[in-house]
C-alpha cells in the first residue's frame, strides 16, 4: 500500500481563508488582530521564519509589526520592550523568535510575555493550563497536527500513539493534546532503549526530534498514521524530515511530507491563536 498524503499546504489555505474572514469581521468592529514579532540577532533561519510569519499576517488582514534588534541587545532592554507590548491594546499576540543570543535568558523572556498574549503557548501559565485540559493557547505545531488529524477523520480515541521527542515546544504538548483526545500515549526520546518496539505497536507516530531517518519502514505498523515534524537537511542539502519518507510511505496509511506537511500548519495556527486572543479582547472591551 502507498500512504495517503496529508497536505499541510492545502489545509493551511482553507484554515487561513476562514481566519481571514473572522479577522475582517473583527476589524469591521474596530478590533483588528495584531501580532508583534521580535527578532534579536541575524540568524538566517530565524529571519526566514519571521518573514513568513509577517507575510501570513499581511495576506490575511492582520496587523503585524516586526521589531529587529542587534545580537548585542541587553536582556533588560528586551524585557522592557515586551512590557510595552503587553500594554499595547493594538497587539494581541507577542512572539519572540528563538533562539536568542546566549547572554539572554529565553525562559525569563517567555515568562515576561503576558499569558493572554503568549500566542506560542510557551508561558508556564499556558503550559500548566494545557496540562489541566483547559488551555488558553495550544502550542502552534502540536495544534496544527491536531487539525490535520481532524481534517482527515483520523480516529484518536483509544488509539496507541507514540511521540518521538520530549521538547517543551512540540513533544510534551503534543503528548498532552493526544491524551486529551483519548489516545494512549507513549513518549520516546534519546534515552529510549528500543524505539522500534514502541513504534511497531503504534497507530499514530509523531516524529519530532530533528534527527534524519530516525523512523524507517521496518519500525512502522502497516496502516499507521505518521506525522513528521522534523526539519533537517540531507547529504545534498535538500530539506527533509525525521522520517525515511520513501520507505515509510509504502507502509503507512497516512503520512505528512517535508516540506509541505506540518510546517505551513505551524504559522497557520499562530494566526488562529492571535485571532482568538483578539476575539477575547474584543469580547471584554
UniProtKB/Swiss-Prot annotation:
GO terms for molecular function: methenyltetrahydrofolate cyclohydrolase activity; methylenetetrahydrofolate dehydrogenase (NADP+) activity. This is Bifunctional protein FolD. It comes from the Bacteria. NADP(+) binds at residues 165-167, 190. PANTHER family: C-1-TETRAHYDROFOLATE SYNTHASE, CYTOPLASMIC, C-1-TETRAHYDROFOLATE SYNTHASE, CYTOPLASMIC-RELATED. CDD domains: NAD_bind_m-THF_DH_Cyclohyd. GO terms for biological process: L-histidine biosynthetic process; methionine biosynthetic process; purine nucleotide biosynthetic process; tetrahydrofolate interconversion. The keyword RNA-binding does not apply. Homodimer. Belongs to the tetrahydrofolate dehydrogenase/cyclohydrolase family. It holds the Pfam family THF_DHG_CYH_C. Keywords: Amino-acid biosynthesis, Histidine biosynthesis, Hydrolase, Methionine biosynthesis, Multifunctional enzyme, NADP, One-carbon metabolism, Oxidoreductase, Purine biosynthesis. Catalyzes the oxidation of 5,10-methylenetetrahydrofolate to 5,10-methenyltetrahydrofolate and then the hydrolysis of 5,10-methenyltetrahydrofolate to 10-formyltetrahydrofolate. It comes from Burkholderia multivorans (strain ATCC 17616 / 249).
Amino acid at each position: 500500500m502507498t500512504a495517503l498524503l496529508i497536505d499541510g499546504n492545502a489545509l493551511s489555505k482553507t484554515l487561513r481563508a476562514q481566519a481571514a474572514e473572522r479577522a475582517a469581521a473583527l476589524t469591521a468592529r474596530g478590533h483588528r488582530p495584531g501580532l508583534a514579532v521580535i527578532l534579536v540577532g541575524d540568524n538566517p533561519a530565524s529571519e526566514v521564519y519571521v518573514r513568513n510569519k509577517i507575510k501570513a499576517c499581511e495576506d490575511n488582514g492582520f496587523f503585524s509589526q516586526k521589531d529587529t534588534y542587534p545580537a548585542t541587545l541587553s536582556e533588560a532592554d528586551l524585557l522592557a520592550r515586551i512590557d510595552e507590548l503587553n500594554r499595547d491594546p493594538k497587539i494581541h499576540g507577542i512572539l519572540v523568535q528563538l533562539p536568542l543570543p546566549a547572554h539572554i535568558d529565553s525562559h525569563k523572556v517567555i515568562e515576561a510575555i503576558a499569558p493572554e498574549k503568549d500566542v506560542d503557548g510557551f508561558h508556564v501559565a499556558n503550559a500548566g493550563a494545557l496540562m489541566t485540559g483547559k488551555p488558553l493557547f495550544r502550542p502552534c505545531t502540536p495544534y496544527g497536527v491536531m487539525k490535520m488529524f481532524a481534517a482527515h477523520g483520523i480516529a484518536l480515541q483509544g488509539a496507541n500513539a507514540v511521540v518521538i521527542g520530549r521538547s517543551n515546544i512540540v513533544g510534551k504538548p503534543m503528548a498532552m493534546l493526544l491524551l486529551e483526545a483519548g489516545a494512549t500515549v507513549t513518549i520516546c526520546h534519546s534515552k529510549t532503549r528500543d524505539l522500534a518496539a514502541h513504534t511497531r505497536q503504534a497507530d499514530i507516530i509523531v516524529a519530532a526530534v530533528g534527527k534524519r531517518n530516525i523512523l524507517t519502514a521496518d519500525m512502522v505498523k502497516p496502516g499507521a498514521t505518521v506525522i513528521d515534524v522534523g526539519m533537517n537537511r540531507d547529504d545534498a542539502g535538500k530539506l527533509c524530515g525525521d522520517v525515511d519518507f520513501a520507505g515509510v510511505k509504502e507502509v503507512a496509511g497516512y503520512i505528512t511530507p517535508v516540506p509541505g506537511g506540518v510546517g505551513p500548519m505551524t504559522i497557520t495556527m499562530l494566526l488562529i491563536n492571535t485571532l482568538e486572543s483578539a476575539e477575547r479582547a474584543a469580547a471584554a472591551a
